[in-house]
Amino acid sequence: VADLRADVRLTEQTEWDRFDPASPEGVLAGRRREHLARAPRSGTLPVAVPTETGSGSRRPSSTQEVFGRVLVGLSRHEQVGRYLVTTAPDVATSTNLAGFINRTGVFAPQPRRAWNVDPVLSWAEGPEGQHLELGISEMNLFLLLGQLGLAWDISDQPLLPVGTVYDPFVLRGLDALVYSVYSGARFIVAGTPSGVTLAPEGGAHQSTITASVGLELPGLTLLEPAYGTALDWLLCDALSRIATGPTPTTTAVPAESGAYYLRLSTRPIDQAPFEQARARLSDAVLRRQVLSGAYRLLDAWTAFPALRAAQDGGTAVPVVHLAASGPVLPEVLQAAHELAEDGVAGHVVDVTSLDRLYAAWQRTLRQGVRTATVPSVPGALRVAFGPRAPVVTVHDASSHAMAWLGSALGVPAVSLGVDAFGQSGTVGDLYRAHDLEPGAIVNAAMAALGLAG
């Protein structure tokens, strides 16, 4: 290396100097520099995404159904609608994108004749379309979402990309998903339907470990709401964060980088419990807690006055927290009522984002480790759970995805979930097989209380 340096008449002090601008090599390098130079590109989309579309319903509805309605509502928004792009690997209608497709059309370089005979679906293909339909290739889905999510950097055109896929098949495209998230792409993917709640279709279509993937993959934020309005808030908030771009953070845990994973369901559930929590907490407080990752759906002291009266009268009423995500909330609420009949106060916590709760917990742990101080309980956990009490976690996913909550709260925990391949049957059949029914939840609560002594 020293000989080469001497041959080209350089020294250690000058070997990285630029060429003489007047020399042939300097002129060539200057031309290439000018050709390749570009102004810094902003990753910010100059639109204000609404905080909600009002697509939630008071009647029983599923999160997949509301997801489709929220996208239709956003497509009507003058500023936001033109930047929305959807894509799916041959499952557009079965993941509830039909309404959006009817409004925006399907992209094709040239107009194509529509051969579709579905009377409720307008499959109009042309250059103005905003939906990209793929064949059955989940790998291509995540590769495309990755490129759409980097369009602001590649072509100076920020977009709001949304993809849908059957939840178990998230794993088919996992390598491309990891690469896209690692590259900093900003997008939303909805895995729907999910879990054994998709009961009739059997184990091949029932996802169990996807929640763990969403929780553990850096740069991807898992969201799993149970109620329509909560989904509306979370989806609009995610799109707003994508439009704004990553913001700097000084905390021990990195800021969300802009990739979001919605785990949804086709199970219609009663929306009344959410509306009751809304009346108890107010819209502003409830929305803040939903976006933070968890809120108290049912407060046992409020819902069961006899328990409060007994507690105030000096009787020690056992207390347990029932934490759950997604479509199992009706069973958890029923278990809380059965526990109340046995004199146990069961507070029901709806966990809308395990990811955000876990990140908050890890942030406090790491700050404690780095400063040699005792970590505190994160605010989001403290607000949703309140004073310490044993916890039962219930999840239509692997039981280990929520099992860490006991450690975070510093209490005994019993975790219920799906730790075996599913079978075909009714939702009730599958919930019984995996201990997700109210009776099993009650027994788990008693076990947790027993562990607490």
How does the language model describe each region?
Residues 1-453, ...:
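Thiamine diphosphate
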